[in-house]
């Protein structure tokens, strides 16, 4: 069944791409760039890294612009740095974002927001020092007994559309898996230069595929936070096994872990769907 779904997605994209302009009439209308980007994402999820690289390159040939987070932070750091001030800044990831292949927003969706969500302290620790994307979007705040990182940017944020940063990082991983580690790190560092402050920036290098993927995954988890992408990557890497990882965090003094093999990674079919005779007979996809 999974293979049939992949084939349906690929057929849909490959059939439509020939009739699409490079970019849509508006950012709400996908063009070839969005189709190529979705093909790259799909092939990556299928672990077909040759094809994922091919389509990431095709998407980047249409649009390779990245958001300048260093510039955005420098433009706004005066107000961001003010003690006790939590500004509301217009996001660079809105309708006019230059890194879009297409814009996807829906009210009341976890993949869309009119303001960036706050994040807990343990999640903030996952960003690199000097990360202007982090510094532009979050600032530590304590309210009563709770300390967290308050979101600072607002606007209709493109969390669900196809973006160039994802394509760069797909390309980097695919190159790493071909053991082209220098090329992979060059692609990653090209992206990092847009969000690591110059005084903190040091180019990354990797001596193994595992090290390269660890760096790339950190960048992808952070740059595409609140999108479906980090979850999709986790599912793929958990299934592959080689680069699986256990997630841990502390809540109320208690250590909580999520193992790669946990059933909690799988969304069960809704009971209503299983009980509905119109859906035919199918088996629940998790045991718990």
What would you call each of these model-derived segments?
Residues 14-22, 63-66, 71, 196-197:
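Helix-capping and short linker residues that terminate individual alpha-solenoid repeat units
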Residues 186-193, 267-271:
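A cross-kingdom marker of C-terminal helix-rich interaction/assembly modules
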Residues 6-20, 28-60, 159-190, 213-223:
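Extended, hydrophobic/aromatic-rich amphipathic alpha-helical segments that build helical scaffolds
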